[in-house]
């Protein structure tokens, strides 16, 4: 499994988990976050490996679809980049730095 894909799926899961069904959440979390194999998940839920595989693939598409429509992850990345740039450019303005850090903290608390 590619590390980049794993990281992306874990991140998309963090942003959109509440939009998934319980079954989708369980399979994705076990597969990507907990590094279970398809066989281990299948055994855990007493279903076939193929059923687990199909569900995970469908859920990956669902997560990508949510990101395509809502842009929560990509907007989060852009916001953080902009905040970092502002902190560097105005590093001597303590009031501004404090306010930027507050914004950053709010963003991080949400996810």
Swiss-Prot record:
Matches recorded under SUPFAM superfamilies: Sigma3 and sigma4 domains of RNA polymerase sigma factors
InterPro entries: RNA_pol_sigma_r3/r4-like (IPR013324), UPF0122 (IPR007394), UPF0122_fam_protein (IPR054831), WH-like_DNA-bd_sf (IPR036388)
Database matches in PANTHER family: UPF0122 PROTEIN CBO2450/CLC_2298 (PTHR40083), UPF0122 PROTEIN YLXM (PTHR40083:SF1)
Function: Might take part in the signal recognition particle (SRP) pathway. This is inferred from the conservation of its genetic proximity to ftsY/ffh. May be a regulatory protein.
Record NCBIfam families: PRK00118.1-1 (NF001066), PRK00118.1-4 (NF001068), PRK00118.1-6 (NF001070), YlxM (NF045758)
Family statement: Belongs to the UPF0122 family.
UniProt-listed HAMAP family: UPF0122
Name of protein: UPF0122 protein YofM
Gene giving rise to this polypeptide: yofM
């Amino acid at each position: 499994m590619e590390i980049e894909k794993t990281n992306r799926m874990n991140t998309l899961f963090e942003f959109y988990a509440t939009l998934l069904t319980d079954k989708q959440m369980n399979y994705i979390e076990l597969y990507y976050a907990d590094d279970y194999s398809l066989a281990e998940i299948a055994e855990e839920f007493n279903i076939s490996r193929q059923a687990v595989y199909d569900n995970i693939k469908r859920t990956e598409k669902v997560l990508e679809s949510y990101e395509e429509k809502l842009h929560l992850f990509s907007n989060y990345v852009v916001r953080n980049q902009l905040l970092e740039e502002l902190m560097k450019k105005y590093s001597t303005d303590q009031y501004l730095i404090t306010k930027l850090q507050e914004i950053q903290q709010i963003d991080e608390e949400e996810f």
